[in-house]
C-alpha cells in the first residue's frame, strides 16, 4: 500500500485520516445527542467537557486533512459513472467538510458566547457573554449535525463512491 494517493486509489495517509475521522464522529454525534436531553449535573459537565475536547480535535483533524488533500491528488471516479453523479459526489464531499467545520466552529462559539472559557489545547479563548448569539450558534450546531448525518448517508449509499471505498 502506498502512503500517498494516486489517481486510481487512496493512499495509507488518506485512509488513516478517513478512519480516525469516522471513529471520532461515530462517538461524537451520539454523545452530543445524549447531552441535549441531560439535566445539569456533574455527569453532564464531564460529558460536555469530553464533547468539547473531541470537537476541538475534530476541528484540527479536519484542517490537517484539508491541507493534506490540497497537496495530494484525489483518485478519479470510475469512468462508467455519469457526469452528473460525479459532480454530485464531489459537491457532497465539499459540503461534508463545510458541515464538519461549521459544527465545530459553531459549537465553540456557542460555548464562548455562553460565557465559558474554551481551551483550544494551545491557548485559551474567552469573549464577552451574549446569550442571544449563543442560542443562534447552538441552532447552527444542531442543524449542522443533521446536515452531516444526511451527507454521510448520501456518500455511503451513492454509487459514485463505491469504487473508491477506503
What kind of feature is each model-predicted range?
Residues 1-10:
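Short, Lys/Arg-rich, polar N-terminal cytosolic tail immediately upstream
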Residues 120-138:
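Short, membrane-exposed interhelical loops at transmembrane-helix boundaries
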Residues 63-85:
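Membrane-helix interface/capping segments
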Residues 156-159, 163-166:
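Single conserved hydrophobic/aromatic residue that forms the stacking wall/gate
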Residues 92-110:
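Hydrophobic alpha-helical membrane-insertion segments
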Residues 107-126:
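Juxtamembrane non-transmembrane "cap" segments at the membrane-aqueous interface
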Residues 26-36:
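Alpha-helical transmembrane segments of multi-pass membrane proteins
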Residues 133-151:
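Hydrophobic alpha-helical transmembrane segments
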